[in-house]
Every structure is written in C-alpha cells, then in structure tokens.
Amino acid sequence: MRNVLTTLIIGLTSVSAAFASGGDGPAIPSQDWSFSGAFGTYDKAAMQRGYKIYREVCASCHAMKRVYFRNLEALGYNEAQIKNIAAEYTVINKEPNDEGDMFERPALPSDAFISPFANDNAAKYANGGALPPDLSLIVKARGNGSNYITGLLTGYEEHPPHGQEVADGQYWNTYFPGHKLSMAPPLMDGQVSYEDGTPETLDQYAHDVVQFLTWASDPHMEIRKSTGFKVIVFLLMFAGVMLSVKRKIWSDVH
C-alpha cells in the first residue's frame, strides 16, 4: 500500500510540474507578483495599465464576457469614470422599443465587456478558422497561469532555433507547448502609451496585462485572503481561551 501511495504522489507531482511548465520546452520563468503570498494584493496602477492594453490591443480579437464595466471599480475607477468608459461602446438593447424594433444604445456599467465579434462563427472567420479564447478566466484555465501567459507574451522569437521550421502564418514561441502557434506577437516595445511614466516595454506590457487578467480570473482574491487571516486570528484567540479554561478546570481538580 505504501508503494502504491508513493507511486501516486510521484505521478501527481510530475503532472503538476508538467502543467506548471506549460508542457514541453523550458520552464516558465517566475515573475515577482504583488498578489503572491498570503498577504499579496493586486496592484491597481498595474491593473489600470493592463486594462488599457486589453482595450487597445487584446480586445480586437478576444472577448471578456464574464467581466462587467461596473467591475472596474476594483481597479480604482470611480462611478463617473466607469460610466464614461462604458458609454464609449454601443450595445443592442435586450428588449425592443415601443415599436417592437431592437435598437442600439450606449453601454451602461451593468453591461458586460463588449465582444469584438457578433458570434463565434464571425470570430472564426476573421481569425483563419480559429476561435480566439475568451480571456475572462484565462489565467485560471491552466496551472501557473500568470507566469505562463507572461512567458507566452514575451516568448516569441524572430527566427526558430537551428533545425526548426515554421509554416507560413505561424510563429515560434519558446514557452508555447509545441512552440508553433498562429497568433502573431501581440505586443512590442512602444506600442501602448503610458501617461504615468511607466516604461513602455514588452516586459512591462506583459506584466501589466497579466496583472489585469489575473484579477479578472480571481476578483475576490483579496477578500478571501483577508477573511482567511481573520479566521486564523480568531481560531488562535479561541484556542488560547480554551487552553486557559482547561488549565483553570484542571487546577481546581488538582
């Protein structure tokens, strides 16, 4: 029985390592994330920059159907800013007007992020038959998601290694399983302007947009950590009280 358990543990460890590294190829580099650890929190400035990158670059192909404009409050935007951001988009109202016709209106904070395509078929047609994944939960979709996506965004090589070839329309990526993918490098130095003086580099872009995507995948992380800490403190205090009660009871017995 012990040998079986040992084998199972080794197998699970190997599988976990494979997922964490993204499959074959070199290990995914670990980044220094503000949200790491028991007391980690999201960096709101980085999330706002990441949202800017999503709007200006990623949103042309990728939807985020599970995120609503009102959720941007967590990034530090106030109510007026959120209304202005939402109003930049138009949506088809879910209910017809008095004449029975569907109509377009400015988006509201209660609306979900606007998808770049009307439906999946339109998305596939515009992307050579491939459906761009929704990014709402992309970080949670695989182990080591934040580091993996950062590696994916920064792992493109202009030329494949010696002896390797890529077909027309494909690109070589160091950290993508199989290394060959159809998505062109989405980010490059100087592509998106930052107003706060943050370096406009590929590495910084990747760090910021992944900070935003990590929040989108796990928006309640900070609350969960805070609640967990309070529970631990309560349990420690409760244990101390119970220990005192026990000592008092047994002292009377003796």
Which residue stretches match the model-derived regions?
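Positively charged n-region of N-terminal signal peptides that target proteins for export
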Residues: 1-4
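Bacterial N-terminal signal peptides
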Residues: 7-16
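Boundary at the C-terminal end of the N-terminal hydrophobic targeting segment
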Residues: 17-22
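Electrostatic cytochrome c docking/interface patches
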Residues: 27-52, 63-82, 197, 217-224
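The canonical Cys-X-X-Cys-His
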Residues: 54-65, 209
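Membrane-proximal low-complexity regions enriched in glycine and acidic/polar residues
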Residues: 92-180
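Extended, hydrophilic extramembrane loops/domains of integral membrane proteins
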Residues: 176-177, 181-218
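Juxtamembrane interface at the cytosolic side of transmembrane helices
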Residues: 224-227, 233-254
